[in-house]
C-alpha cells in the first residue's frame, strides 16, 4: 500500500535536505497520516487519513 491519504490523495514528495554548508541530500517529505474509522461508501472502514482532512471536516465518523 502506498503512503497516501485515502480521501484527498496526498502522498510523499521528494526534496532536498540542506545542511549549513549547503550540501544537498535527497529525502522524502511524508504526510501526517492517522488511522481512523471513517464512513466510506456507506460502510465503516479503517482508513489512513491526513490530519488536514481530519481538521477540515472531510471525515465522517461512524455512529456508535
From Swiss-Prot:
Q: Name one GO molecular function term.
A: structural constituent of ribosome
Gene Ontology process terms (BP): translation
Q: Which Pfam families did the record assign?
A: Ribosomal_L28 (PF00830)
Keyword entries, A-Z:
Ribonucleoprotein, Ribosomal protein
> Per its UniProt record, what Gene3D superfamilies does this chain match?
Ribosomal protein L28/L24 (2.30.170.40)
Query: Which top-rank group of organisms is this from?
Result: Bacteria
InterPro entries from the entry? Answer: Bacterial_rp_bL28, Ribosomal_bL28, Ribosomal_bL28/bL31-like_sf, Ribosomal_bL28_bact-type, Ribosomal_bL28_sf
Q: Which GO terms describe its cellular component?
A: ribonucleoprotein complex; ribosome
Q: Which HAMAP family match?
A: Ribosomal_bL28
The family line of this record is:
Belongs to the bacterial ribosomal protein bL28 family.
Tell me what this protein is called: Large ribosomal subunit protein bL28
List the top taxonomic levels of the source: Bacteria, Pseudomonadati, Elusimicrobiota, Elusimicrobia, Elusimicrobiales
